[in-house]
Structures are given as C-alpha cells and as structure tokens.
C-alpha cells in the first residue's frame, strides 16, 4: 500500500523581537519636554508683578540688594547713590548713545533681538570668550530689577519670561526710562542722574556729547572701567566707534565729531 504524499509544512522563523529602545527614547524625550513645561509653568506663576512699575518708580532693585550683600560679606558698607530723573530730564544724546550701543532695534523688537543674539554667540565662540552681549535693553532691565546675577539655563528662562512680560505691560518709553534710572554705572552708582552728578558734577540733562559717550562706553563693565578715565585702549576704541556711529546718524556736526576723535585718541 502506497503512502500518500503529504506536504510538509515549512518551518517559519520566529519574528524578531522588537527592541524597546525606540519607545524608551520617545518616552525620554517626552519626559524631558514635560519637565521643561512644568518648570516653565512654575517659573511663570512666580514671576514678579511688573504692573507695579508701570507708574511707580522703584527705589530699590535686585541688583542693588545683591551688590550691597556682596560688600557686607567682605565687612564693608556700600554707599548707594541713586537719583530718579524722568526721561524728559535726561540728555537726548545720552539716550541715543545708549540705544545705539546697547539695543539698536529697541523700538522694533518685542523684547528679544534674535539676530543680535546669533551674532553675539558667533563672535563669542570665535574669540573663545564673552566679548559681546546679546541682551536687549528689556532683558537687561529684567535682570537689574528682579534677578540676582547667575549663568544658568533657568535664570535665562526667568529673564526671558520677565522681559516678555515687561514688553506686554509697559510702553517702550517707560521701559527705557526705567532702564536709564536703575542701570549700574559704578559701585553703588545707579541711574543716569547719579552717574552724571558723580562723574561730571552736572545733571543728566546737561551732558555734553563727550560725557554722554563716556558714560555709555562703561555700561559693559562699570566696575572695571571709568567714565572719567581714557586710559583703557578698549574704552578709547569703543568711544571712537560710538562717536562715529552717532555722527553718521547726524546727531552732531563734523567739528564736534573731530573734537571727540581728538579727545578719545589721547
């Protein structure tokens, strides 16, 4: 009796087990994003009430308290010199010099100048040191009013959120007025009026082009550089460049520009 041939089932290879790495990576990214959102939310709900400075002039800022605490730790007392001046009583030349030097697109942006930040990062990476800041006037105001100096991602996030809140709440004119009245111009020296009186013995409204440029040039590091001294080569170059940019915008005439060049070259 012949056996009937039956087809033999081919052995099927077991399906390869899927490794969970893709899912793990996806969950990890999601977890990080959720963590960032949670921290951002926490920071946002604890932001200062910037409505308070819409009309009220602050008598004290975070940077003032921080500087005084630094001196106290060394057993010293820092004398605070601070006089308030409305924008109408600050030299237009000083205002223009600040805008040109610190934030040339102040009236165009909404708190951040992305192009300036990119250029600053590229220049700093090229020089392998911080030689150019990318912060707008609004960001600088946020730091001075509410934050202690620090270089952390969360600190930058706080600064960014406060800057955005300032831009939404205050007019550009008010932001500029606040900035010019709380910015540091030396140890214990805050605001344009205090700087003008201390450095040049006059009101901020009476500053000459040379004095305005000298004051603005030291904003980068008022604890290292002096507005009344021309000894630093870096300051001389910075002042010459700022004078040139102001002259190009017809903020003063050619004889004044030539006089400034002579002054800042010595």
Task: Enumerate the language-model features and the residues they cover.
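Juxtamembrane regions of bacterial inner-membrane/periplasmic proteins
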Residues: 2-266
């Amino acid at each position: 009796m012949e056996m009937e041939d039956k087809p033999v089932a081919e052995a099927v290879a077991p399906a390869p087990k899927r490794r969970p790495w893709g899912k793990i990576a996806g969950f990890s990214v999601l977890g990080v994003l959720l963590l960032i959102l949670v921290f951002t939310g926490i920071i946002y709900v604890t932001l200062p009430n910037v409505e308070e400075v819409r009309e009220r002039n602050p008598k004290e800022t975070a940077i003032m308290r921080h500087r005084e605490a630094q001196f106290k730790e060394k057993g010293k007392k820092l004398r605070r010199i601070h006089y308030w001046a409305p924008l109408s009583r600050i030299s237009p030349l000083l205002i223009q010099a600040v805008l040109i030097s610190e934030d040339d697109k102040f009236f165009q942006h909404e708190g951040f100048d992305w192009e300036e930040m990119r250029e600053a990062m590229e220049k700093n990476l090229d020089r392998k040191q911080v030689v150019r800041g990318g912060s707008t006037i609004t960001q600088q105001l946020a730091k001075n009013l509410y934050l202690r100096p620090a270089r952390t991602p969360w600190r930058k996030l706080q600064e960014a959120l406060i800057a955005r809140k300032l831009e939404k709440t205050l007019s550009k004119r008010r932001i500029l007025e606040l900035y010019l009245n709380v910015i540091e111009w030396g140890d214990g020296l805050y605001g344009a009026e205090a700087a003008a009186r201390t450095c040049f013995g006059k009101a901020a409204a009476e500053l000459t082009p040379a004095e305005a440029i000298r004051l603005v040039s030291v904003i980068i590091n008022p604890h290292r550089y002096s507005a009344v001294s021309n000894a630093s080569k870096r300051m001389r170059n910075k002042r010459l460049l700022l004078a040139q940019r102001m002259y190009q915008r017809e903020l003063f005439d050619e004889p004044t520009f030539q006089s400034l060049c002579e002054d800042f070259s010595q």
